[in-house]
Amino acid sequence: MASNKVIGIDLGTTNSAVAVMEGGKPKIITNPDGSRTTPSVVAFKNGEIQVGEVAKRQEITNPNTVRSIKSHMGEEGYTVDIDGKKYTPQQISAMILQYIKGYAEDYLGDTVSEAVITVPAYFNDAQRQATKDAGKIAGLDVKRIINEPTAAALAYGLDKQDKDEKILVYDLGGGTFDVSVLELGDGVFQVLSTNGDTHLGGDDFDQRIIDYLVAEFKKENGVDLAQDKMALQRLKDAAEKAKKELSGVNQTEISLPFIASNDNGPLHLQTTLTRAKFNELTHDLVEKTKIPFENALKDAGLSTSDIDEVILNGGSTRIPAVQEAVKEWSGKEPNHSINPDEAVALGAAVQGGVLTGDVKDVVLLDVTPLSLGIETMGGVMTKLIEKNTTIPTSKSQTFSTAADNQTAVDIHVLQGERPMAADNKSLGRFQLTDIPAAPRGIPQIEVTFDIDKNGIVNVSAKDKGTGKEQKITIKDSNGLSDEEIEKMMNEAKANEEADKKKKEEVDLNNEVDQLIFQTDKTLKDVEGKVSEDEIKGVKDAEEELKKAKADGNLDDMKAKKDTLNEKVQAVAVKLYQQQQSQGGEAGAANGDASKKDDNTVDGDFHEVHDDDKK
């Protein structure tokens, strides 16, 4: 039976998390490692797909390890090549989602089929569609795609519905950056504006440390570590660790022994990185977040004095220089009441609760982050829907032909803020044909844009004269067809079955090893106390099981395991009965002794151990 719960998933660049509503509150579900977040890392090893911490641990040694795949969602033509097979970002993301879905099901004790998944507010249509496709491949019906800052605001404001507040969410994650301004009041969470950069995050801060270490090492030793893949991976791990440590201390040691070698022998990287140096290396990255910060306020028609609370979200907001900058720009001490690693998943769970009716009196009004329009004469982008328009929404505009007797029009759909079509993101093209021949400017072509609650775009074009209509759901050129998604779903299901079988195999092997160990122990205990035939029967069954284990036939192993188990139990029971019988005889003898006359002299006694009997 499927659970009626809608889980909330924060599908992050660096880490992911999942939450569910319980008792009217969102709760993070821990993964099998006991952690509240899961590294967004996938590794392929010996035909097995591994996700999370186990995958992250082998980044240095396993070249078939994929991280930060979110940075490539919706990217045209991007694939990952693993052992000659190409995987799209949607497929890799689906593997992460499948793993999360699995441990959420273990926690809930039910199958999970529905989810709310979060995306950066500044994700375009192609990136949103790719995220939805990833969910579908993983076997999830994605009920809603919501923006990460909005989700963080839901987590913050769930128990503050009686307040009227304007809040600014500054969200700096592993690979993306967003700023959203929201108004909260009477259970309504209304997004006023959003801005950001989908290619700016903690990974960039790590890279600055890596570049610095590479340059310093080359200067000292004449060796370029950037050319050595394994050394580079060790540097990545060290940079991430140093960045985190510098959030709590003023300096940290970076020690990487045997990082390289030259004619004189092995070389070691040993250095101290101070917070001041780290701030110097990353100052421009922090400053890069200022323009979206200011634009979000400007688009909302507000100044910093109008903002009641500034919420920090995303692991990278733990960087002291980031916190100081936000405090300086906003003139307010940022609110630290929500966990920046968990807030988005918690907010997604709240939205899941809204959809199932578990959460009452909460309304979420989000916006489209970028303007939408079509290309018109002269290569101009004509906007139909302006950025920061509340969604869902629909807008129509009438256009005409550009030439006499034109019988078809090409509709080129665009997303962005630039005046010229070529400078914006192309979402797709379609054609309206069979327009009756007429002088230019006479045919009336009505173009309608619909944006659904997930921020996904549908466009239609209608000839008002004939009533003929053509419509499409926008798919990026790297988007997946329904057939491709179906195929990937089947592959994901097959992988899930293979993973399940692999786990069963490991569990069975462990049970067999444990039984063999127990058998050997039991045989020692019963030596000389049961018949030789019984002992031979156990030993023969044990050898049969060992042979089945060596052959790797799971069904045979199960059968032989059950047989051996029965025989071991039988001799163990017999030994127990013998001991009981001996105990009874000893008790009877003691009873007879107690019937002797009362002229008994008390004497000293000592306990007789088995060793004393020998």
Swiss-Prot record:
Give yes or no: UniProt keyword Phosphoprotein: yes
Q: Where is the composition biased (Basic and acidic residues)?
A: 593-614
- Which organism encodes this protein? Fructilactobacillus sanfranciscensis
Induction of the gene:
By stress conditions e.g. heat shock.
Protein's name according to its UniProt entry: Chaperone protein DnaK
Query: Which GO terms fall under molecular function for this chain's record?
Result: ATP binding; ATP-dependent protein folding chaperone; unfolded protein binding
Region: Disordered, residue numbers: 576-614
Task of the protein? Acts as a chaperone.
Q: In the record, which positions carry Phosphothreonine?
A: 176
Report biased composition (Low complexity) as residue ranges: 577-589
Q: What UniProt keywords are attached to this protein's entry? A: ATP-binding, Chaperone, Nucleotide-binding, Phosphoprotein, Stress response
Q: Does the keyword Nucleotide-binding apply?
A: yes
Task: State the family named in the UniProt similarity comment for this chain.
Answer: Belongs to the heat shock protein 70 family.
InterPro entries, per this entry?
Answer: ATPase_NBD (IPR043129), Chaperone_DnaK (IPR012725), Heat_shock_70_CS (IPR018181), HSP70_C_sf (IPR029048), HSP70_peptide-bd_sf (IPR029047), Hsp_70_fam (IPR013126)
